């Protein structure tokens, strides 16, 4: 089964659903709101007539629950504010909510009533756009704004990390760690560069002239891809999985062959791919830090693990079996609680934010 068939957030609105556990992503959206507002408002020129009758907005990897609803609200309010400033007529707004086919679009669409009630006097529309952002999604020159929060760091496939003899090089781990050989780090970076370049290349023909793209990725601050704030929870999950192996609940070979299809880039790595791909000019680029330790709600081990479970469980359950998920995350919470007592836990969440403008006179093949 391909990654595109198993990467989605936990469905529904139950205890472990993404709807109930996406608090961290909402904090990221709030922190990066000014950048999104500026990108939206840059679509309007300083005239007294609206340059656009319809604004087409794509949300890549929108997921479900409060995250896409909050992003939609920010876009609507930014356009309302700019049109009020210019004294121009409000355009209609068409949202294209994109995610893989496994996404719970039913729950997503049920939540739209919140936005409908909030913006009764704004003419806006929403439609689903299932598909992979690693390929084409929309017609040429059709999108004015492409937005993505915490999606494009997902890889199209897990990097192949084996020796020439076919043996796992990252045994006992599910991501890079301090003990991983250089080949593991190189494989992850290479896969990210290939996939992120595809995201840019396929969006370029889809954006209208002077269109903007705002991408928010879960990243890292340092040049070291195994820094603690990035790898901590994945190392913790690997430890919990190893415990289940020792209990005979998981086959050791399954753990040895598993690597998460996810990469946390640095700002420099993101900018390097953008420059090399060549379709966009970078208008803004920054690293945003959120403190998640101390007295923050995320210092509660149970909440922290639920926050991780809501987006990682589908991939993990496909590899190891749905029947062990409760035991896995219970063990992870137990390890995390002990680390909290000893002050070992990671305390920061890092985001990379870029605002890109489509270059003119592009030629596509």
From Swiss-Prot:
It is an enzyme of class 2 (transferase). Pathway: Alkaloid biosynthesis. This is Probable 7-methylxanthine methyltransferase 3. Belongs to the methyltransferase superfamily. Type-7 methyltransferase family. It comes from Theobroma cacao. One of its GO terms (biological process) is methylation. S-adenosyl-L-homocysteine binds at residues 18, 62, 67, 99-100, 132-133. Binds 1 Mg(2+) ion per subunit. Involved in the biosynthesis of theobromine. The record marks 147, 218, 262, 322 as: Involved in substrate discrimination. InterPro entries: MeTrfase_7 (IPR005299), MeTrfase_capping (IPR042086), SAM-dependent_MTases_sf (IPR029063). It catalyses: 7-methylxanthine + S-adenosyl-L-methionine = theobromine + S-adenosyl-L-homocysteine + H(+). Theobromine binds at residues 25, 150, 153-154, 311. The keyword tRNA processing does not apply. The keyword Metal-binding applies. Its cofactor is Mg(2+). Keywords: Magnesium, Metal-binding, Methyltransferase, Transferase.
């Amino acid at each position: 089964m391909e990654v595109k068939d198993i990467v989605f957030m936990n469905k529904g609105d139950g205890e472990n659903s993404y709807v109930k556990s996406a608090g961290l992503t909402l904090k990221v959206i709030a922190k990066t709101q000014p950048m999104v507002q500026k990108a939206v408002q840059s679509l309007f020129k300083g005239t007294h007539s609206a340059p656009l009758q319809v604004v087409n907005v794509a949300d890549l990897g929108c997921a479900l629950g409060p995250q896409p609803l909050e992003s939609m609200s920010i876009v609507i309010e930014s356009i309302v504010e700019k049109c009020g400033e210019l004294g121009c007529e409000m355009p209609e707004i068409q949202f294209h909510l994109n995610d893989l086919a496994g996404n719970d679009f039913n729950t997503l669409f049920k939540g739209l009533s919140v936005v409908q009630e909030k913006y009764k006097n704004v003419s806006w529309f929403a439609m689903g756009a299932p598909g992979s952002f690693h390929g084409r999604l929309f017609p040429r020159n059709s999108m004015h704004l492409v937005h993505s929060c915490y999606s494009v760091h997902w890889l199209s496939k897990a990097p192949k990390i084996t020796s020439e003899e076919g043996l796992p090089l990252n045994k006992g781990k599910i991501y890079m760690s301090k003990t991983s050989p250089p080949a593991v780090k190189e494989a992850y970076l290479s896969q990210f560069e290939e996939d992120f370049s595809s995201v840019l290349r396929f969006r370029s023909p889809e954006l209208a002239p002077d269109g903007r793209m705002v991408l928010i990725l879960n990243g890292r601050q340092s040049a070291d891809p195994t820094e603690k704030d990035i790898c901590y929870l994945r190392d913790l999950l690997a430890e919990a999985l190893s415990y289940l192996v020792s209990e005979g609940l998981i086959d050791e070979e399954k753990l040895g062959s598993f690597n998460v299809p996810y990469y946390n880039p640095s700002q420099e790595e993101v900018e390097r791919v953008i420059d090399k791909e060549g379709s966009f000019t970078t208008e803004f680029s920054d690293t945003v830090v959120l403190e998640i330790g101390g007295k923050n709600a995320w210092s509660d081990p149970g909440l922290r693990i639920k926050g991780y479970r809501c987006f990682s469980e589908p991939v993990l359950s496909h590899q190891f079996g749905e029947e062990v998920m409760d035991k896995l995350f219970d063990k992870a919470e137990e390890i995390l609680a002990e680390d909290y007592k000893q002050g070992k836990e990671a305390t920061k969440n890092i985001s990379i934010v870029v605002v890109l403008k489509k270059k003119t006179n592009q030629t596509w093949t």
